[in-house]
From Swiss-Prot:
The species this protein was found in: Phaeosphaeria nodorum (strain SN15 / ATCC MYA-4574 / FGSC 10173)
Subcellular location: Nucleus
Composition bias type Polar residues, residue spans: 32-45, 150-159, 169-179, 300-318, 362-384, 392-402, 546-561
Entry-linked InterPro entries: ERT1_acuK_gluconeogen_tf (IPR050335), PAS_13 (IPR056751), Zn2-C6_fun-type_DNA-bd_sf (IPR036864), Zn2Cys6_DnaBD (IPR001138)
DNA-binding region: 63-91
Membrane recorded as keyword: no
Function description: Transcription factor which regulates nonfermentable carbon utilization. Activator of gluconeogenetic genes.
Region (Disordered): 1-56, 150-214, 300-411, 536-561
Protein name stated in the entry: Transcription activator of gluconeogenesis SNOG_12336
Any one annotated GO CC term: nucleus
Domain of life of the source: Eukaryota
């Protein structure tokens, strides 16, 4: 085989195909037959399949020339073959075929040993992002600026010096890179300078402190050397670094100082710009909170992300924001802000500060923060938070998490089991029920009502005779305890409900029932006087309330006088026909069905005072008055909102409803509570 020409050994950067063929021919010459080498007096080559044959060490990455010629390369640079060919000045690692998910990655990032080939890690400035403009952003002249002396090791900023305008007294402004997490305390202060009147936004090294929060081209952001992890992929190591950066929030610091994103000293990036900070100017200081953010951003939740508040001697503060309201991968929130729930460890997010410290003052702090994003939230000072945290017992591995939602209601059962000293007097309750029936029903309906009451009233009296006072007190305790459970259940449902005793006295209702009928709970329970004049016109016109004396229940001589306003009875909330149907259903289900429940259609009377009744009569008498439609749509009136719900039954004073109710019993199998779910019939009520 003829030797290659002399021109092939020229250090030309252009690799031609004839050069690759010559290098392949050279390999064939080196791997000649044993007979050819033995004739020259050399040791014959071993068989390629011989296991004792010495193997060539495989290189991590072939150079560009050996890769094109498909030759075995070495790890040294320049490699042996390029030195032999005279191409040592152009020997560099070849580029492997990219995977689909790495098509957008630069070629330099895929090189082994990123620190020697990626331009930004050599100290050169990276190319500005497309979103950054090159125009000048005017800035109002601030007060005196102070620089800080470096403390500890820090990442070397770009070596290219950017000229800045000279300040007063011939002192120049330092162009050091500002860290992402400024320190909490600043012990050293440099000479005061004045910032320039305008700063070019297209200089990434100059405006690094206002750039993206997570710069994928900054390996020092994640506090380790990516090239030393031997991942073989820069972006794969970057992903692991991001996971480590986020998981660092669960590690509590060893001291009371702040913990930055890398859990090291805050000055690892070098000195930064301090906004008008100095002992002689305390009003223009820029304090930093324990989450390594400026106090302006700590106290003002509405401040944008990636903004730096610089307090001036004047009352105004200049906010430099180049990220706007963007929340993408370049201008996203802090890694510690991913979990907004409370935590027992110190975090670095203003929105995720220790929620347990604000539990008594503001239990819905997180919900209020998201509901009022444009309004500032009051925050306690870091010193106060650390003081409260120091007084707490040491935290364990398992701690209960305090949710920011509706917490479980504390049940005070002591007032039930220790406060009830006497039973409820059902004798007075049924006497009031008979009096209400005489006032509400006509003669024909009153006879039916008395018949329904006689079906279960004697049975209740006979069972009561077998119970002593302690049994009756225990029965009342069970009633109040069941009532507490029912109230907790009904608060989770938006259905209007009503709870009464077996004698009809109201014991509880919810706000939906008040919206539907106008009856407030204080009036129903007898805490306020009942001023209702809407009786439903149940009696006939020729009858008076005191027409006969034989139908009224006589007063018993041994009873105590009434002390206070009694509770409203359930049949007082219905018209005569609906109340009679209720008494009929209760008489049938009181003893016959152990799990008695029924449903009926009823007209509930709205709560109307004398003033309300006069106003309605005046509106009816006015011929020019036209009733307004509640909600006008193509299909007719549609119920919408609480205001429309309050207008149900405004014309005739009755709300057409569907009632589903069931009976709650005690341990003696006696009916004690009647639970009613009231739902309005909207198609009729809104016409």
């Amino acid at each position: 085989m003829a030797s290659p020409d002399a021109e092939d050994a020229s250090p030309s950067p252009e690799y031609r195909s004839d050069l690759d063929d010559d290098m392949a021919a050279e390999q064939k010459t080196d791997d000649g037959s044993p007979s050819q080498k033995s004739s020259n007096g050399q040791k014959p080559a071993s068989n390629a399949k011989d296991p004792l044959r010495p193997r060539r060490k495989k290189a991590r990455r072939a150079c560009f020339a050996c890769q094109r010629a498909h030759l075995t390369c070495g790890d040294e640079r320049p490699c042996t073959r390029c030195i032999k060919r005279g191409l040592q000045d152009h020997c560099m690692d070849g580029v492997r075929k990219k995977a689909k998910y790495l098509h957008d990655a630069p070629d330099g990032a895929l090189m082994p040993g990123v620190g020697g080939h990626y331009p930004y890690m050599n100290g050169n400035r990276p190319t500005p992002l497309p979103s950054q403009d090159t125009h000048n952003v005017p800035m109002a002249p601030q007060g005196n600026m102070y620089t800080q002396a470096p403390s500890g090791t820090f990442y070397q900023p770009p070596s290219a010096q950017i000229p800045l305008p000279q300040a007063q007294h011939g002192r120049s402004f330092s162009d050091q890179q500002s860290p992402l997490s400024p320190p909490f305390s600043q012990a050293h202060h440099g000479p005061n300078v004045n910032p320039p009147s305008s700063i070019s936004q297209g200089q990434p090294g100059q405006m690094q402190q206002f750039g993206p929060l997570f710069d994928p081209s900054d390996p020092a952001l994640f506090n380790f050397d990516i090239s030393s992890l031997n991942f073989g992929n820069h972006y794969g190591a970057l992903e692991f670094g991001m996971l480590g950066h986020m998981s660092s929030a669960v590690d509590a610091p060893n001291d009371n100082t702040m913990m930055n994103a890398m859990n090291q000293t805050a000055n690892m990036y070098g000195p930064q710009m301090a906004g008008a900070y100095g002992p002689n100017n305390p009003n223009a200081a820029m304090p930093f909170a324990q989450n390594s953010l400026p106090a302006g951003e700590w106290q003002e939740s509405q401040s944008r992300q990636n903004s730096m508040h610089i307090h001036t001697p004047t009352s105004s503060a200049t906010a430099l924001d180049h990220g706007g309201h963007r929340h993408d991968s370049l201008n996203g929130p802090h890694a510690f802000a991913i979990g907004q729930g409370p935590s027992s460890h110190s975090t670095a997010s203003p929105a995720s500060t220790d929620a347990s410290a604000f539990e008594n003052d503001n239990p819905l702090s997180t919900a209020t923060f998201f509901a009022n994003t444009n309004r500032g939230q009051p925050q306690r000072s870091p010193t106060t938070n650390r003081h409260h945290q120091g007084n707490r017992p040491p935290s364990t591995a398992l701690q209960p998490i305090h949710s920011n939602g509706v917490r479980k209601r504390h049940r005070d059962t002591k007032s039930i089991y220790q406060g009830i000293k006497k039973p409820f007097d059902y004798v007075k309750g049924y006497h009031r029920l008979f009096q209400i029936c005489h006032k509400k029903f006509s003669k024909s309906l009153l006879a039916q009502a008395q018949q329904y009451l006689n079906l279960y009233r004697p049975v209740l009296l006979s069972v009561r005779e077998e119970m002593d006072t302690d049994d009756l007190i225990h029965q009342e305790m069970g009633l109040q305890r069941n009532l507490m459970t029912l109230q907790d259940h009904f608060t989770e449902v938006g259905t209007p409900f009503l709870i009464c005793r077996r004698s009809g006295e109201i014991v509880s209702c919810n706000k939906e029932f008040t919206i539907l009928t106008g009856w407030r709970q204080d009036v129903l329970l007898g805490r306020e006087p009942n001023l209702n004049v809407n009786l439903g016109n149940s009696r006939e016109a020729d009858e008076s309330e005191m027409s006969t004396q034989t139908n009224t229940t006589p007063n018993l001589t041994g009873q105590e006088a009434e002390t206070g306003t009694p509770a409203v009875n359930a049949i007082q909330l219905m018209d005569a026909k609906s109340a009679l149907e209720y008494l009929q259903n209760f008489s049938e289900l009181c003893w016959q069905d152990p799990h008695g429940h029924a449903k009926q259609r009823a007209n509930m009377l709205r709560y109307q005072t004398k003033a309300d009744f006069d106003r309605i009569q005046e509106m009816k008498a006015n011929a020019d008055h036209k009733s307004d439609a509640f909600v006008k749509m193509e299909g007719g009136a549609v119920h919408q909102g609480e205001s429309a719900m309050q207008r149900l039954g405004a014309k005739n004073g009755m709300v057409d409803c569907m009632i589903w109710w069931h009976i709650k019993r005690d341990i003696f199998e006696m009916p004690v509570l009647v639970c009613m779910s009231v739902m309005p019939v909207l198609d009729k009520g809104l016409q």
